[in-house]
């Protein structure tokens, strides 16, 4: 479930009967054929600065622009209570605690009672869970109990990252938990076919490839700056590569350097 500037991929729900399984699939179209009530559960959202927060912000803004109603569920952060978004939406703020290795962020604690109360009062058409922490797990359990369709995001290879932080011995247990978590959903969104193939080989089911969108008005050849290129000492036709992100082992920056070397050939 992700938005580009031109296209909007909206989660559609097909329930053939009360007693049959729910099927979630993606379809591209412009303005919504009908308005959906979507509850988004996440550990992070702007003003947090990270890839998941930025991606979710774009997704929520795009869904709102197409007429959908969003209810955001997230832990209360230290510096702010209200999320930042281009348009208003409802929020449920829950208790949280600092995340190990990312103390600037807070991990949502289980919130079964709050979620059951909210979703019983205002039942969503679909619950979308972006993170797999205690808050996400409790959201998954409540949604299943209330028979609400659930989609999830697989954005972070926590099992692969574990070796970079001295807990590689937990890799198998982490992967097992992630597989159990996502396989309990009706659909799991992944950004690339490569990741989908890898997860499928590890026993993950109902994977949907949803590539990252690009704002073609913001990132456009019309904004090309010769002054900026001159400051880089880059010629007119020379390829310039830019990496934006943390300098961390799990970012696989060796691949960036290898790609750069191949591009120069």
Per-segment meaning from a language model:
Residues 100-129, 134-141, 145, 172-176:
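An amphipathic, basic-hydrophobic alpha-helix
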Residues 182-192, 208-210:
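A short beta-strand/loop micro-motif in the catalytic core of glycosyltransferases
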Residues 220-234:
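A short helix/loop element that forms part of the nucleotide-sugar donor recognition site in Leloir-type
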Residues 234-251, 257-262:
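Conserved donor-binding/catalytic core segment of Leloir-type glycosyltransferases
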Residues 76, 194, 213:
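Carbohydrate-associated surface elements
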Residues 149-151, 160-180, 190:
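Nucleotide-sugar donor phosphate/pyrophosphate-binding loop at the beta->alpha transition
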Residues 211-220:
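Short beta-strand->alpha-helix junction loop in the catalytic core
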Residues 2, 7, 11-95:
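N-terminal subdomain of nucleotide-sugar transferases
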